[in-house]
Amino acid sequence: MTSQRSPLAPLLLLSLHGVAASLEVSESPGSIQVARGQPAVLPCTFTTSAALINLNVIWMVTPLSNANQPEQVILYQGGQMFDGAPRFHGRVGFTGTMPATNVSIFINNTQLSDTGTYQCLVNNLPDIGGRNIGVTGLTVLVPPSAPHCQIQGSQDIGSDVILLCSSEEGIPRPTYLWEKLDNTLKLPPTATQDQVQGTVTIRNISALSSGLYQCVASNAIGTSTCLLDLQVISPQPRNIGLIAGAIGTGAVIIIFCIALILGAFFYWRSKNKEEEEEEIPNEIREDDLPPKCSSAKAFHTEISSSDNNTLTSSNAYNSRYWSNNPKVHRNTESVSHFSDLGQSFSFHSGNANIPSIYANGTHLVPGQHKTLVVTANRGSSPQVMSRSNGSVSRKPRPPHTHSYTISHATLERIGAVPVMVPAQSRAGSLV
């Protein structure tokens, strides 16, 4: 058998060749990094089986700072180039002469805002098959700006301080390294460093902590430094005058407050005492009327004692001071007495023939030879009222007494004067 070639075979081969020769954009490197201010080349190549008469190329960018707003970078269409967004004017162009299968572009004087994702869209009619988009990422690197160094905290000896270092710009984000500019280039033993945050914490600073410190900010494309002078302050003598003044002022204030409190207390106490005194009853009781006859006088001997003596008097209406009864002269019971020392006195008539005088119920004897009987009691026993021969007396209990008599002549010689005294009620009030 002989094989026969089909007449359709060449047409099939041409058809397969056309499919294989359709437009295809080459793989991109993925990402390109460039320092700010340096030119960047974004590659994009393709293959096609058709002529480049109808070539159409569009470059688009999706900014990193605003992913929702894609922008046109450059356009080639119908044999002409057109500018894209205003910020790319004068900085963007194709690397080769157009039309060509290499549609790469360049960006001069790259800026931080140029960072983003770039897309290359290629169309060349009649080729319509295959992948016609290429994607390239652009990252504009920024070296660290000059860092700013500062000290946070008190620089007094024994305190804790924090050294801060930061750069406003830097892509990628810079790291920070602190060092002390001395022979060892090492930080103090009490220091802890955070290279990401750019801080150094030095605890319990001392004189050895003083010195010049340097912060180095660095990233992939550059470094930058700043210097910081740390001077630990030694203790200063305090102002004794200010301290003494403050203490004195505080003491005066405290004393004033204490005096104010004491004054208020004593005022309150005296006020309460006055109110209590006002509540105590002070009644004067009248036991009986005074004698109606002015000529009739009752004589009363008043003796004061310096040691807790109490004066009492006999009743002018119920007692007989003077009597012509001889028994009266021998009666030693007292007419009046003093309670504490126990001394009591009685007046008696020395002449029984002298007539007695009664005035308003009172028996008076104005004769001569009058005597005074004194009864002394050394005890402190309570006293009771007693009545004997018309005379009223208080005698102590128990009755351990010593009596003696004072003659009328002796009374006249010492200047004794008969007086009238008010009587006492049972409650002790004078009337």
UniProtKB/Swiss-Prot annotation:
Positions on the Cytoplasmic side per record topology = 263-431
Annotated disulfide bonds: 44-120, 165-215
UniProtKB keywords: Cell adhesion, Cell membrane, Disulfide bond, Glycoprotein, Growth regulation, Immunoglobulin domain, Membrane, Methylation, Receptor, Repeat, Signal, Transmembrane, Transmembrane helix
The Ig-like C2-type domain covers which part of the protein?
144-234
Indicate the secretion signal residues.
Answer: 1-22
Region entry Disordered: which residue ranges?
379-402
- In this UniProt entry, the residues modified to Omega-N-methylarginine are 378
Out of the domains of life, which is the source?
Eukaryota
- Give residue ranges for domain Ig-like V-type: 23-136
Q: Which membrane topology term applies here? A: Single-pass type I membrane protein
Q: Which SUPFAM superfamilies match?
A: Immunoglobulin
> Which stretches are tagged as biased composition: Polar residues?
379-392
The GO biological-process annotations, alphabetized, read as: cell-cell adhesion via plasma-membrane adhesion molecules; homophilic cell adhesion via plasma membrane adhesion molecules; positive regulation of long-term synaptic potentiation; regulation of presynapse assembly; trans-synaptic signaling
Name any one GO molecular function. ionotropic glutamate receptor binding
Q: How is it modified after translation?
A: N-glycosylated.
Q: Which SMART domains match?
A: IG, IGc2
InterPro entries per record? Ig-like_dom, Ig-like_dom_sf, Ig-like_fold, Ig_sub, Ig_sub2, Ig_V-set, IGSF11
> In the UniProt record, which residues carry a glycan?
102
Kindly give the PROSITE patterns that the UniProt entry links to this protein. Answer: IG_LIKE
Tissue specificity annotation: Abundantly expressed in testis and ovary and to a lower extent in brain, kidney and skeletal muscle.
Its primary localisation, in coarse terms, equals: membrane
Give ranges for the Extracellular compartment.
23-241
Q: Please give the Pfam families that the UniProt record associates with this protein.
A: Ig_3, V-set
UniProt miscellaneous comment: The last 20 cytoplasmic amino acids are not required for the cell adhesion function.
What function does the entry list?
Answer: Functions as a cell adhesion molecule through homophilic interaction. Stimulates cell growth.
- Give the protein's recorded name: Immunoglobulin superfamily member 11
In its UniProt entry, the species of origin is given as Homo sapiens (Human)
Its organism's taxonomic lineage begins at: Eukaryota, Metazoa, Chordata, Craniata, Vertebrata
